[in-house]
Amino acid sequence: MKRVALLAVGSFNPPTIAHLRMLEVARSHLETINTQVVEGIMSPVADSYNNKPTLIKSNFRIQMVRAATKSSDWIRADDWECTRTTWTRTIDVLRHHRELVQEKFGSDVGMMLVVGGDVVDSFTRILPDGSNLWNSSDIRTIITEFGLIVLSREGSNPLNTIQSMPAISEFCDRIIQVKDEVCPSGVSSTRLRAAIMNKKSIKYSTPDEVINFIRENNLYQKI
């Protein structure tokens, strides 16, 4: 049986049930193809990721991810990425965790990246300075050396995005696409932040432990 660990990266600003379901659905699918998932890792980005005023400090975000995963027996929060002083490329985060996972579980354990379809759609995004948000060679390595699992998201079309990229389109068949048939959700961190600012309830869209942390620290009151 093949063994892998799953990595989810992102702002987690705040973490939602959709983030947790993404990992759960990925694991459930892998189990049907004779693959054991030994661990799930949620890695928030560092504060240097961007200068958006909505991105709260990483010390708050990592604590929320810890709260969100507290009851899980296989998903954990990791602060390596978010405590670095500079932004870290996803490929380097994967390499870091693969090394640690193999030390912990054995050299045969692989590492796979789990993302939403909206992240794949960002593969072709051009930044204001004209540079690419994603490096094509990084994407190629993620797909061929690690493994990419994509959860379908509302309004995203990851397959079309991949097919539009000459450097990686030939690897479409290596990407695992999954869909949450049990609990499809349009919940997002953006919607939660807006709801909090507008004094609306976010109960059941994120674990109660996260809600309590947000309330205790007076987070997202202004956007």
From Swiss-Prot:
Keywords: ATP-binding, NAD, Nucleotide-binding, Nucleotidyltransferase, Pyridine nucleotide biosynthesis, Transferase. Pfam families: CTP_transf_like (PF01467). CDD domains: NMNAT_Eukarya. InterPro entries: Cyt_trans-like, Euk_NMN_adenylyltrnsfrase, NadD/NMNAT, NMNAT_euk, Rossmann-like_a/b/a_fold. It catalyses: beta-nicotinamide D-ribonucleotide + ATP + H(+) = diphosphate + NAD(+); nicotinate beta-D-ribonucleotide + ATP + H(+) = deamido-NAD(+) + diphosphate. Its EC number is 2.7.7.1, 2.7.7.18. Its cofactor is a divalent metal cation. Gene3D superfamilies: HUPs (3.40.50.620). The keyword Disulfide bond does not apply. Belongs to the eukaryotic NMN adenylyltransferase family. This is Nicotinamide/nicotinic acid mononucleotide adenylyltransferase 2.
